[in-house]
């Protein structure tokens, strides 16, 4: 049976999941990304990241005040203090891009055009790879999916936790629901990274090695010359010492 401590953390995780789903559903147009909830002795600090923070703040903070009431009454968070920020790079945020693709499809833009535009936008911001999967009744009554990919996309391994961001969204159309799945490999240096040097870089390395070898050769030649001079000078020194003794 789980202890009280385990139950406490399970309930906290469940509460954060409910808050995240509620915000994603209600601030879909704002490009909602994620939320962070920190409970302190003075109240609850809530940080919300979204592509368009103004839609969450509202006119003169009206939406923020309504959010505070929801957090207090629905989720039972005492004294909530809300802060809204924009992600560091919305173009590399999988959830923001998934919501943007879904909104574009809902506006009637062809899904292939939306997917290719999103790939160009994401890759131009430094992503190592991106994969977009769009599924549903795309061109006929029969459901299917199409996958669009660029760069290198990791599906397993420890690099998934370090570099990969993944999110899903849904576009609601009269003919049915279209699913959007986005995987973004953020900028970084993976373990299997191999960089091939250019001809100029290879030439510079070869020249540096050659000069180092030549300098070592000169040092050895100088040392051998000194040894020869020292050996040649020794018999004369011994002869002078013999004459002094005689």
From Swiss-Prot:
Disulfide bonds: none annotated. GO terms for molecular function: rRNA binding; structural constituent of ribosome. Residues 226-237 have a biased composition (Basic and acidic residues). Residues 218-246 are annotated as: Disordered. Residues 19-98 form the KH type-2 domain. It comes from the Archaea. Pfam families: KH_2 (PF07650), Ribosomal_S3_C (PF00189). GO terms for cellular component: cytosolic small ribosomal subunit. One of its GO terms (biological process) is translation. InterPro entries: KH_dom, KH_dom-like_a/b, KH_dom_type_2, KH_sf_prok-type, Ribosomal_S3_C_sf, Ribosomal_uS3_arc, Ribosomal_uS3_C, Ribosomal_uS3_CS. Keywords: Ribonucleoprotein, Ribosomal protein, RNA-binding, rRNA-binding. Belongs to the universal ribosomal protein uS3 family. Part of the 30S ribosomal subunit. Binds the lower part of the 30S subunit head. This is Small ribosomal subunit protein uS3. The gene is rps3.
